[in-house]
Amino acid sequence: MRHWQWLLVSLVALGGSGCAGYKLGPVNGLTPREKSVQVIPFDNQTLEPRLTDAVTSQLRKQLQRDGTYQLASHNDGDIVVSGSVTHYVRQEVSFSSSDILTVRDYRLELSAQVTARERSTGKVILDQVVIGTTLIRVTTDLTSTERQALPLLAADLAKNVTALLAEGGW
């Protein structure tokens, strides 16, 4: 009987120590939704149209989904996020097996210079280039395929920006 008690105590101690470092909620020390974020529409420095609308929209959605910050919409956010879309690149990933000059898949990459400032102090808490990527399979109409992939590309960029803001690794 004594052997089972020690085994049970050991299992409970081992199980409890496995969860010792886990933290529920935001990992940057904030209480969830304690601060609010205002997202200013991004500037487009590329020749590709409609990028900034998708990026701004997806960033707002991702911030709401994450829950670390409350989304502010009327110039009253504690943190103001702004940025510029700086690069849009389409790179060949794979080619058709029957014709080595025909591209089968592209990797789309979107880069943005993102800045986050505290409204009250003006202190810059994030200022770096963030990249989002996605893969597309070429169909008969490359332009339509790229247009359909734009929300996915913007969502990946928004996810990366939100992670930088929420985790507080500035």
Task: Describe every region a protein language model picked out.
Residues 1-19:
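Sec-dependent bacterial lipoprotein signal peptides
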Residues 18-61, 68, 73, 120, ...:
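A structural "domain/chain start" motif
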Residues 2, 9, 29, 73, ...:
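Generic marker of residues within folded, mature protein domains
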